């Protein structure tokens, strides 16, 4: 590998996710835990603090860290489920090994995050595929100082020849890695760039000795985020207890509730 429309009232709108008011929650959605909706400003932090936030169900979104157990999907309220991969339990599925072999002709460069014109142009192509709640810019997802906030930031740029076709961004703690965001040119979907860059990030995380890789939230209903469950070693957090427990890999096309 070469390393060169929310129908319910909402009180916060965060980058395409609507956070529901408590009154709406109690009348329209029954969940077996206390309603959580927390936001805090981001700043450069020690790796141990970044680890702790991720372990407690926080995720990083632009200039803020957010933590919420309810969102909406297709105008319906649902629960959120923080997920992570315990890297000591991770193994490549046969389809993932096949993808890595298929993409050996791509060139990968990794280094500190730098947002330039090339990545901004790629983001414009990427957001064209988003049909609802289209984000304004990359900084809807990344801090204005993404190379150092909330921690050391690294990017994985994927090229076909000289063309940038995908780029993903991670932030490093002492033991944990946050998969913060990924952009790609939808014209090159045949390379499965979203899954491919996740695999690059996971392999890098293992190489650096990380313990956990955090891809963010999935929903309690089937959604576009279910690809995050397509990995061995996955765990999910219980909002009520804060305890992480293993869950089975959910291959593409399988209902996520079967995992």
Named regions from a protein language model:
Residues 1-4, 259:
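Short, Lys/Arg-enriched, disordered terminal segments
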Residues 3-11, 16, 21-31, 37-107, ...:
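Acyl-donor-binding surface of acyltransferase catalytic domains
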Residues 5, 14, 24-55, 140-143, ...:
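Acyl-donor binding region in acyl/amide transferases
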Residues 108, 132-135, 193-196, 203-206, ...:
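Glycine-rich loops and low-complexity Gly/Arg-rich segments
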Residues 102-104, 127-130, 187-189, 197-200, ...:
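Short, low-complexity, polar/charged sequence segments that are solvent-exposed and flexible
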């Amino acid at each position: 590998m070469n390393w060169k429309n929310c129908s319910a009232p909402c009180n916060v709108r965060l980058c395409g996710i609507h956070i529901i008011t408590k009154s709406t929650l109690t009348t329209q959605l029954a969940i077996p835990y206390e309603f959580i909706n927390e936001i805090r400003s981001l700043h450069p932090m020690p790796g141990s603090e970044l680890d702790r936030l991720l372990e407690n169900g926080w995720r990083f979104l632009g200039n803020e860290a957010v933590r919420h157990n309810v969102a909406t999907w297709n105008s319906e309220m649902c629960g959120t489920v923080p997920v992570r991969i315990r890297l000591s339990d991770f193994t490549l599925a046969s389809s993932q090994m096949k993808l890595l072999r298929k993409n050996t002709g791509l060139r990968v460069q990794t280094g500190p995050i730098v947002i330039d014109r090339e990545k901004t142009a790629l983001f414009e192509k990427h957001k064209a595929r988003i049909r609802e709640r289209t984000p304004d810019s990359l900084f809807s997802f990344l801090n204005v100082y993404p190379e150092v906030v909330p921690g050391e930031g690294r990017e994985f740029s994927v090229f076909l020849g000289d063309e940038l076709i995908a780029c993903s961004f991670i932030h490093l703690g002492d033991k944990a890695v946050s998969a913060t965001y990924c952009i790609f040119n939808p014209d090159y979907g045949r390379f499965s760039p979203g899954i491919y860059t996740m695999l690059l990030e996971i392999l890098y995380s293992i190489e650096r000795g990380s313990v956990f890789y955090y891809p963010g939230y999935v929903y309690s209903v089937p959604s576009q985020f279910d690809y995050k469950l397509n990995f061995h070693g996955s765990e999910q957090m219980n909002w009520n207890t804060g305890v992480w427990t293993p869950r089975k890999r959910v291959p593409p096309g399988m209902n996520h509730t079967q995992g």
